[in-house]
Amino acid sequence: MAIAKAEILESIANMTVLELSELIKEMEEKFGVSAAAATVAVAAAPAAAAAVEEQTEFSVILTAAGDNKVNVIKVVRAVTGLGLKEAKDLVDGAPKTVKEGISKEDAESLKKQLVEAGAGCEIK
């Protein structure tokens, strides 16, 4: 019993204003929505979808070097490819972003390495 969208649109186009009003009321009752709320929901849906899509890339932020700064510098050098001075400056300047635009799995792995080295970090 599949009805094509074109058939539905054609039926609606042939309705009078009174019939359209009754159709809208029946749809509101059947689906438990109001016409005004449906407009807002449609406008908000693309923004929500965009927010979900953006969460495919994560950033790991070093919040504190901790007590064992040497180990933290070693981990930062290993994962970023920075030189000793650059890695030390990054660790000393916490909070700083260590890596950004990485997958959730990579971010979790990097966070684990930094925490094991004694650093404080978070994923955003």
Swiss-Prot record:
Gene3D superfamilies: 3.30.1390.10, Single helix bin
One of the GO BP terms on file: translation
Domain of life: Bacteria
One GO CC annotation: cytosolic large ribosomal subunit
Keyword annotations: Ribonucleoprotein, Ribosomal protein
Single GO MF descriptor: structural constituent of ribosome
Cross-referenced Pfam families: Ribosomal_L12, Ribosomal_L12_N
Stated family: Belongs to the bacterial ribosomal protein bL12 family.
Subunit structure as annotated in this protein's UniProt entry: Homodimer. Part of the ribosomal stalk of the 50S ribosomal subunit. Forms a multimeric L10(L12)X complex, where L10 forms an elongated spine to which 2 to 4 L12 dimers bind in a sequential fashion. Binds GTP-bound translation factors.
Function recorded in the entry: Forms part of the ribosomal stalk which helps the ribosome interact with GTP-bound translation factors. Is thus essential for accurate translation.
Name of the protein described by the UniProt record: Large ribosomal subunit protein bL12
Species: Nitrosomonas europaea (strain ATCC 19718 / CIP 103999 / KCTC 2705 / NBRC 14298)
